[in-house]
Amino acid sequence: MFNEITKSVTWNGQVLELSTGKIARQADGAVTVKMGNSVLLCTAVVANKAKEGIGFLPLTINYREMAYAAGKIPGGFFKHEGKASDREVLVSRLIDRPIRPLFHPAFVNETHVTCSVLSYDPETPVDILAIIGASAALSLSPAPYLEIVAASKVGLINGEFVLNPTLALLKTSQLDLVVAGTSDSVMMVESEAHLLSEEQMLEAVKFGFESFQPVIKIIKELAEEAKKPKLEMQALYPASLKKEIEKLFVKEIEQAFAIKSKQERSTNLDLIPEKVLTHFVSDIENKKYSNYQIESALKAIESDILRNEILEKNRRIDGRSTTDIRQIACEIGLLPSAHGSALFTRGETQSLVSTTFGTSLDEQIVDSLEGEYKERFMLNYIFPPYSVNEAMPMKAPSRREVGHGKLAWRAINPILPNKVQFPYSIRVVAETTESNGSSSMATVCGSSLALMYAGVPIKAPVAGIAMGLVKEGKNFAVLSDILGDEDYFGDMDFKVAGTSEGITALQMDIKISGVDFKIMKVALEQARLGRLHILEQMNKVISKPNNELSKNAPSTTTIKIDKDKIRDIIGPGGKVIKEICETSGAKIDISDDGTVSVYASDRDKLKVALDKIKAIVVEPEIGEIFNGTVVKVLDSGAFINYVGNKDGFVHISEVSGERIETVSSVLKQGDIVKVKLIGFDNKGKAKLTIKNADKDKSSNNTKPKTNVNNTKDNSEPEQRRDSSKKRAWNEDNNAETAEVITERKYFN
């Protein structure tokens, strides 16, 4: 019944198996990928008819993680997979980027690739398997897919490169890099790094590139046995058509490209296609040429003009040389109510960035195949239509926005303080207010400025730059800080972010059939110099984090308690913790390890909540003195609430140093009296005395001391800061079972 074909290779100690002919046989291409206990089904479907006139390849990649793959039922009300998660969107883009450039340039048939994770093994990189499976499925389909792509993941642990590290290993790795390519060229790189040098990054790419070559071999073997006939493709346009358009309109196109302003240049260029189509109207009516052929030839001429200026004259359309960076302007503290804000402008690209602090309760909950976890740092990239002067409605975040936001997140994340050093959750929102190339790297720069102004103790300022490439044969030019047109007509978009000491994020996309390591080396070094220049401009405005938080930021304190006391703070059905929050106005978060984080809008609210918590968890010592409240009076004595929710009993003989007839003659419910703990009965209930209690020293152990280190950066505007909100770290301070391990106060 099945004509199954299987190819396998031992890769990094595990067997990678590709098979076709058993599942999804009606799809143009279908491959089952297996490694360890991971199983993916990757399919490719190609429409029979071309979709002419759209000007781009209508390729759609959908990566799906099925909950059953990890033995889970989807959470939420609807128990089925719904809208793609950010993780699924990011992997879909990861698959798309090395594959898209390898189709025939004239191919415009709608193409859908679906990669579904059917069984999940955390010991295997399913995103890498998805790229491999998608490439294999396309190689079997009729699509004119010109090269075969494979990919690998690279980590750096203890100075050694690790191929396809597990999730557990990635937690200790200095590098998380994905590289994809063909048998002779690199097509795509994406990474997060902990301040690695350009040399280390290049070596990591080489290591990954060499590692996936055996995978390309088995994909080729599978395609040789199972592929379908490829669609025959024609040239995009006749060569004679291009020559005729050049003869008539090249001067006008050159004049338009000589305009340095993006808006004016675009306006003039947009007028030309109508003139060209009008000139060829009779040829269009006679079906000698199609509109699409004419527009394609015109775009090719525009590309030639831009590229020749760069390669032959070392001159770009805005007048810069290949290494020049556009003019930079930085401003901080624009938004008075935000916890931190910055405006970063580079040429005609601009990003308005804000920073907001929250509690651990505000952290992003992520439900994945690995299980549920929280993200403390969130970065949202927004690209509104007005940034490029387009009249379009605002929509939900696009795949592009999700991808750009994650790239900026990778650039910033390695330099953030850990939760012990800085207890807040952090949300950064970067809105692109103008765009003419490299808006994601403007987001990185603006985020660094906003975080420092907000007072986040980042390790070092971070800047990002986008590099471009124009390549004709062996002749090439690497461009620093590319414009939108240079991205569109160029051959590469190579984004590099990092500090003055090293790289934190890298992303490379290629539009040609790949680049070699010589070009990558030149691009990395040129990016380093550009990054240092940008950092120099940023440092003129702010070079280190402020020592004080915004007056609008919440106050926070963290204490450590005995884990057995957690239930006492929470109370039955959450009654106690709810009462503390309602009466104090604070927010409280309790971790399983006994870490209690308290957040409030001001110092007084924080103190009320903290005192209530300490009163609950404190273990009183015999001989301590407390201010107690009489809760019930009996003939034999009185019950007194002496600390937190703890009550003790004062026998009638311990009420006074003198003889009394009745307890009620001395004590009434609600009275505040000093009591001394003198012991516990055989049931563990406290025995108290009022006699001579005021002659002994009072207890002060319920309030651990806090060491506060007050510092202030006088260079910042006084009116934007509250001098009482200081960063303060204290050493361990014991108070019996209540032990303050890291108390940080940012008080009003």
From Swiss-Prot:
Location(s) in or outside the cell: Cytoplasm
Domain KH span(s) in chain numbering: 554-613
PROSITE patterns, alphabetized: KH_TYPE_1, S1
Limits of the S1 motif domain: 623-691
Record: residues binding Mg(2+): 487, 493
Low complexity composition-biased segments: 699-712
Pfam family, one: S1
GO terms under biological process: mRNA catabolic process; RNA processing
SMART domains in the record: KH (SM00322), S1 (SM00316)
Protein EC: 2.7.7.8
Main location, first listed in the record: cytoplasm
Cellular component aspect of the GO annotation: cytosol
Basic and acidic residues biased stretches: 713-722
Keyword Manganese on entry: no
InterPro entries the UniProt entry points to: ExoRNase_PH_dom1 (IPR001247), ExoRNase_PH_dom2 (IPR015847), ExoRNase_PH_dom2_sf (IPR036345), KH_dom (IPR004087), KH_dom_type_1 (IPR004088), KH_dom_type_1_sf (IPR036612), NA-bd_OB-fold (IPR012340), PNPase (IPR012162)
Segments of this protein annotated with the region Disordered: 691-748
Known cofactor(s): Mg(2+)
Swiss-Prot/TrEMBL catalytic activity: RNA(n+1) + phosphate = RNA(n) + a ribonucleoside 5'-diphosphate
UniProt keyword terms in alphabetical order: Cytoplasm, Magnesium, Metal-binding, Nucleotidyltransferase, RNA-binding, Transferase
Molecular function terms, GO-annotated: 3'-5'-RNA exonuclease activity; magnesium ion binding; polyribonucleotide nucleotidyltransferase activity; RNA binding
Family per record: Belongs to the polyribonucleotide nucleotidyltransferase family.
Function in brief: Involved in mRNA degradation. Catalyzes the phosphorolysis of single-stranded polyribonucleotides processively in the 3'- to 5'-direction.
Protein name: Polyribonucleotide nucleotidyltransferase
Organism, scientific name: Rickettsia africae (strain ESF-5)
Organism classification: Bacteria, Pseudomonadati, Pseudomonadota, Alphaproteobacteria, Rickettsiales
Recorded name of the encoding gene: pnp
